[in-house]
Amino acid sequence: MCCKNEYQKRAHGEVERIFRELLPEAGLHVREEQIRLCHEMLDALMKNEITLCDAGVGIGKTYAYLTACILMRKYSVLHSGYSGCDGRPVVVSTSSIALQKAIIEEYVPFLSDVLLKADLLQGELKAVVRKGKEHFVCDYRLAQRLEAVRDKNKNQVQMEALKSLRHNFDLDSVHNLSGFDRRLGCVPKFCPRECPGKAGCRYQKHLDTSRKEDIFLQICNHNYLLADAMHRANGYRPLLADYRALVVDEAHKLPEAASQMYGRSIGKEDVQEISYFLSREHKGSEGKRLQEWFAALQEEIRKHRKDGIEDMAGKESFYFPPGAGSLLAQTKERLQLMIRRLAGNIPYWIFRRLEEMDELFGWFLKNDKRYILFLQQDSRGHLTFMAVNREIPKYLDATLWSRGFPAILTSGTLKAGNGFARTRQMTGLEKETGVRECVAESPFCYKENCLLYIPENLKPIKKGSREEAEQLAGQIRDLVCSTYGHTLVLFTSYILMGSVQQLLRDQIPFPMVQVWRNSQEEIARFKKMENAVLFAAGSCWEGVDFPGDMVSSLIIVKLPFSVPDPIHEAQREQYRSLESYIQTIVVPDMQKKLRQGFGRAIRTEQDTCVVSILDHRAAKKGKYRSDVLEALPKCRMAERIEEVEDFIRSRKVERYYS
């Protein structure tokens, strides 16, 4: 025991040296909370435990967990008595491609260089990104696609993107590639054994590299992590190499990924894809029938459906209308006949896609209680059949946490209110004992650099009314003028955003940019402008950085409560009272989303910003005032617009107004 304690002490001593000496010498700041966070993470890894780490904006959590993993590997042979050179990597799972790219191109090379120069490593750190086949180029299929479009009048930009795949293996790294070209040029779900391109296949070379014992980090997204876990649970070949520890960054997104992986869906694009692959097998007439049946079914559903409520992503969810049941049954019968006709005549993976569609239709017809069954309509009016498993936390526990490896789950929004109860519930850790919890506060001085403005004159107005849009437009106009532009306005509804923007079109003396559903081009345009107003919803609540004076005013129009949908209704059934459900589920989820939005305000130590909340429920006598203040960092408070003007004048220099 004494030896183990000594090795652990030495490992923690190296944390101090790395963050107090080596990284500052390389240009980074000393951050006490970052150091404390790394100690917590290292402790959990070396004691084979799970830790939940809520890391505030600007902490530098990536360096914290990478350093903890490096030292865990270095001292594991001494501390735990098993071979530290057994070839087992650490898996880092993230939600975003941007973070994966940053880890492999920036964080790992930088940290490796610093530690090598200090003789804390024997060799460079090696990492590889692992993701599904559909993210990589199949050279054989690419050659076929290029030949097919050689003499066609194809869009020149898309053509150049397609040609660039000869040199770019990762599809995610190529811009302007059409979705159709992407589907036709990617590695198929099942590679034929006698593939003529096998000898020089870049994908196979990538797999060979990723299996080498000198790979320290395997980086993947949450879906790939869960797919690997499902493979292991079902006795299939794992997708990832056996790993000694797991880091789940952006861990607040893990339950959403689990909903996708442990459920099933079928929409228009899925049907089109299946039809295309049927045509490649000379079964084009069958594919055409499939598309016709699905189109007719969608039309029948639209005739009988009841309106749903638009969520923050601009989608509507609603239950399957009974009036469309007879056509669904007829479509299922036709599909079963098609499956019998095609048995043994098409590749198994295409055949399995048809079987899965048949199973999903069957769940809807018999109202299978294992799943939350509903339809989802996107902004284009396309419908998707959705089946979400009711026991996602149970599956996460069974396929991940019960396997006994140490794990770090980290994000800026794991904590809600006073604790981690909601996160434990959603991630399957509710029944796990010995799970550690850590909160590392942001190093930013919010009391000095951030003003929280909640107007004193807010009043409840009928939701969706003209009066509501007019009141909000007036408040936003006054704020934009008070802060001289430099504004991000976050909405929870695209409909409300459109209404308010129309009212303000001729009232704001600054350029206005409106982001509709993941429009990266519009965000890039806003960033190039010296001073503008960005209206946004959906994905802009998180994962988008606007450092400096670009966003000096963040306006949160409505508190980000989840809309009532079939998933939330199913959760509501588990509680005896509505109030209990609201306090246990609804409020913590709102607090997490609010913190994500608030995080767009201050991105560096030098940033200064006014954050305004225009929802009467956050006002002094509002129902959720205490919940709002509990979720946010301590800031100076304001109720009058004059205080906003004074704050901006006191914090900004002359060029801000030019």
Task: Please provide the spans of the model-predicted regions.
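Walker A/P-loop
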Residues: 47-67
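A contiguous, basic/glycine-rich beta-loop/short-helix subdomain that forms a polymer-engagement track
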Residues: 189-216, 229-237, 337-456, 468, ...
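Conserved interdomain hinge at the start of the Helicase C-terminal
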Residues: 398, 457-492
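Conserved RecA-like P-loop NTPase helicase motor core
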Residues: 455-467, 518-619
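Conserved helicase motor "Helicase C" RecA-like lobe of SF1/SF2 P-loop NTPases
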Residues: 492-516
